[in-house]
């Protein structure tokens, strides 16, 4: 059910973004509410462009937006982590009720809901943050591509309106994309082909796409993905998650051994 809800939410969100993805110039005279939001983002970037450095404004505004959304990101990652932890038990339930008849489906759903409640897991908790984050990031992207005064200027000798001729920003954007996906998937309880492919395919797509995008847009991708890496290490460090998980397994194993020893002693005393 969670997959269906997430798929529906992504379809709905994609449809909404496609409606909002016009390519025309956005200005203070633009008519739609979405374009006014995009223009407000652009003006905020301009206000943060100290010494008329649009590149600096892009960096600062991206960091501010990302920092504001950190609680939502944390909520999403915590929910995803909990869902990963109970995946083996969910698969056991699916094996227990393999039937496709309504009665089996109902029993499976009831036991899954009981497990969610017992473990404090909300299967929908990772959807809401996603619905909020993506429109904000899309508005920021459109501000960089549809507002004229953000398409001019230089940053570290790079023309923000032109692709990076030295390929520095595309490589950095791809590198930070790889690191963020790799770190996110490192602590996954169960590895699968889809996760592995995403780890390597997404950075490649970002790299190739960035060759033809304006440097201002690629600068935004680079800063955004770099901040994503920082967020993961700060809030959902996979090394800490793995360490805690291994410690829990060790404690459970020791407890099991103590119970076995106690049973053996009790058995010897009876003899």
Curated annotation (Swiss-Prot):
UniProt xrefs under InterPro entries: YidC/ALB3/OXA1/COX18 (IPR001708), YidC/Oxa/ALB_C (IPR028055), YidC/YidC1/YidC2_Firmicutes (IPR023060), YidC_ALB_C (IPR047196)
Q: Which GO terms describe its molecular function?
A: membrane insertase activity
Q: Where in the cell is it found?
A: Cell membrane
Q: Name one GO biological process term.
A: protein transport
Q: Which Pfam families match?
A: 60KD_IMP
Question: What domain of life does the UniProt record list for this protein's source?
Answer: Bacteria
Task: Indicate the principal place this protein occupies in or around the cell.
Answer: membrane
Q: Which PANTHER family match?
A: CYTOCHROME C OXIDASE ASSEMBLY PROTEIN COX18, MITOCHONDRIAL, OXA1
Q: What is this protein called?
A: Membrane protein insertase YidC 1
* UniProt source species: Streptococcus agalactiae serotype III (strain NEM316)
Point out the gene that encodes the protein.
yidC1
